[in-house]
Structures are given as C-alpha cells and as structure tokens.
Amino acid sequence: MELRATVENRIRYSTKHIKHLPPGSITEFDWKDYCPVGFGLIQELEGIDHDDYLLSICTDETLKKISSGKIGNVFHISNDNRFLIKILRKSEIKVTLEMLPRYYRHINYHRSSLFTRIFGAHSVKPLGGVKTYFAVMSNMLHSTIFVNKLYDLKGSPKGRSNKKIEVRNTTVLKDIDFDFCFYVDPLARQRIIKQTKLDCELLEEEGIMDYSLLVGLQSKGSCQGSLDGLNPVYGSFAPPSSFKSNSTKSMKTASSSPDRSSVAMYSCSPDRDSVENEMSMTIQSVTSNSASSETNILATTLSDLFHNSSNINFGMKIPARARRVTRETGEEEWYNVVLYIGIVDTFQDYGMKKRIEHCYKSIQYNSNSISTVHPKIYSSRFQDFVSNIFLPHDDDLSSKY
C-alpha cells in the first residue's frame, strides 16, 4: 500500500476576509492532501471519521485563518476544538511525510506513545493567492480541559523565553519560565520515562530535533484562575513528618545564585538509566504485603499503568504534586495538580540551516546548552530532562527531608 501518494482537489469557497485576495463572493482553492492513505490509517487507528475530520478543518473561518497565517509559532484550533492546526514550511511537511510510515508503525505498536497524533498534512492555495502548508494534530487541550499553566519545554533554557504564543487564550510559557518538579506515582514515572525513550529513539533515527514536551498544569479542584493565585497545598499524599510539624514554615532551598531554581529543576531526580531497577524494586515493594487486599488492588492497578500498552490516553490526567522553587526568594511552594503531557513539534530535521544555526550559537553559548544540536544529543538531553522533572512520590521526597 502506497502511504505517500498525494491527492489534489479543487474546492469552491468564500473569499471574505482572506488575505491576498480582493473581496468577492466565490473563489476556488487548490487543496492538496499529502499521503491521504497513510494519514487515513492514523485517523482510523485513533477513531477519527474522515468526513468529520474534513468538515472540522474546512470551515470558512478555519480556511480564513490558515490562508492569512504566518509560518512558525502559530497554532489554530478547529471550530469543534478537536484538532490543532499548525502552519509549516514546505521543508517541515517533507520531514513529516518521510517519517510517516515509521511513525504510523510506531504509534500502532506503542499505543501509549506520548506523540501528539498527526492526522493530516495539507496545503491550500486560493486562486491568485499564496500556498500555505499545514499539519493537523490532535488537540490534547480541548475545550473541556482548563489548564492553569501551559509550557512548551525543550530541556534547554538558552533562548527559551516566552514570545507570547497563545493557545485558546492561554499563554504558552518556555523553559526559562519553568520552575517546577512533579512528584508522581513511581510506576507512572517509570512509564513516562520509558515511553519518552521509545519515542525519542524514533525521532533520533529519523534525524529529527527541536521537538518539545507540552505540559499542561491543572490545579486539582479548580476550573479557573491562575496557579499563581492559588494557595499552595501538599497534595493528596501525606507529607513527611517534618512537613506536618512545621507546615506553615517556608522551606528555603535556594542559594543566593539567581540560577539556583533552574539547577534544581534540571537535576532533582536519579538518572534515567536506573528506571528498570526502580521498576522491579517498586513492584516488589508494592506486592510484598499480599495480606492486604488494598495493596493487591494497588499492585494490579500500578502494573497495568506501566505495562498496558493499549492505553492511548496515557499522558492525560496524571495526578501529581508540583514543587515550585520561586526565583525571587528561593522558597518552595507545593501544589496538587493534574498533568497533561505530550511530545509536539516533530517537524524539524537537522538540515543545513540548523547546522549553521548550531555553529553560530555555539560561539555565544556552550554547545551542549543550546536547543539546536545534533538529533542524538538532543534526544539524550530531552530524555534526561524528562527524568529530572518527574519524580516518584514518598520515597524520593522523604529521603530529602
């Protein structure tokens, strides 16, 4: 079956408010579907009806936004909030199409992949207008999900300040704004790290870099407001005794160095290579008390959490305690949160442009600290970053205090 065949269609649509065209009633769009067979298999795999998909992305308003959009940090959301649309360069479309066969096999075999699913690659060109390339992805933050904070993280703070990107009126923050660690269930952490490794291996083999971890934080029990405006909490798990005896006292963890919080966030967990040993020890610990029915149920649940590869919603609604080190005072704050995570922006290869950018930035900064690096280095650093911000609760936490 040919997964990379391209289909061209011409559709008639309103020209109202479309850039590059004079006002009028009707125009024609040259619409191109790249690899419809391959992306059709992905849509079928994820339970997406193709006709509904086309109706979602071919509305007047959506086409208007796409046709007048800019390349780069621009996201649009379909009217039904099901799909995220990103305008791409032609070279980025090419990277996506070249990866498609292996990408499909990967998400078919690893159903709990953290990849934001790519459902289609298209281009539209109004009659007399400019051709626009774009990809359509799953919207992990659909209209029923409110997040207090949204981060786009690459694992390198160099040049990663916020540039006022917005998704559904939520400002997307970057690495330099990130000051959290997350304490999650040990098996959940192991599965996150293991799946990140599997996903990064594919991207590394395809020569892709510059991807991100999208992290949405939702304060538990709150549907509105900012995380900054909420009172810190300890979370659903009991804090260590040192916390209980002195819960109102601020916990100082930072030195006078202004970069202390960044260091803490990037180096507060064991190395990812110890995950397999952790997993076996955790399972033994959980299952050791077989006399307790609650423990047996918990062991079954946690084993399923880690081993069940058919969980396509993995990465959504992960309960966690968030530890935040404030940059101004170095004090710790704790929040009870629900996490939404996914790997996004898998469109950039390490081509000539990125190689030149790497050389230029290496003159200014440490070559290992910039985001533009060889895919193998990028993959390793990205995995280390993920393992350093996701921590198992209780054991790691108790050992620190």
Curated annotation (Swiss-Prot):
InterPro entries: PInositol-4-P-4/5-kinase_C_sf, PInositol-4-P-4/5-kinase_core, PInositol-4-P-5-kinase_N, PInositol-4/5-P-5/4-kinase. Residues 242-268 are annotated as: Disordered. Its EC number is 2.7.1.68. It catalyses: a 1,2-diacyl-sn-glycero-3-phospho-(1D-myo-inositol 4-phosphate) + ATP = a 1,2-diacyl-sn-glycero-3-phospho-(1D-myo-inositol-4,5-bisphosphate) + ADP + H(+). SMART domains: PIPKc. Keywords: ATP-binding, Kinase, Nucleotide-binding, Transferase. GO terms for biological process: phosphatidylinositol metabolic process. Residues 350-371 are annotated as: Activation loop. Residues 1-390 form the PIPK domain. One of its GO terms (molecular function) is 1-phosphatidylinositol-4-phosphate 5-kinase activity. Residues 242-260 have a biased composition (Polar residues). Transmembrane segments: none annotated. This is Putative phosphatidylinositol 4-phosphate 5-kinase 11. The gene is PIP5K11.
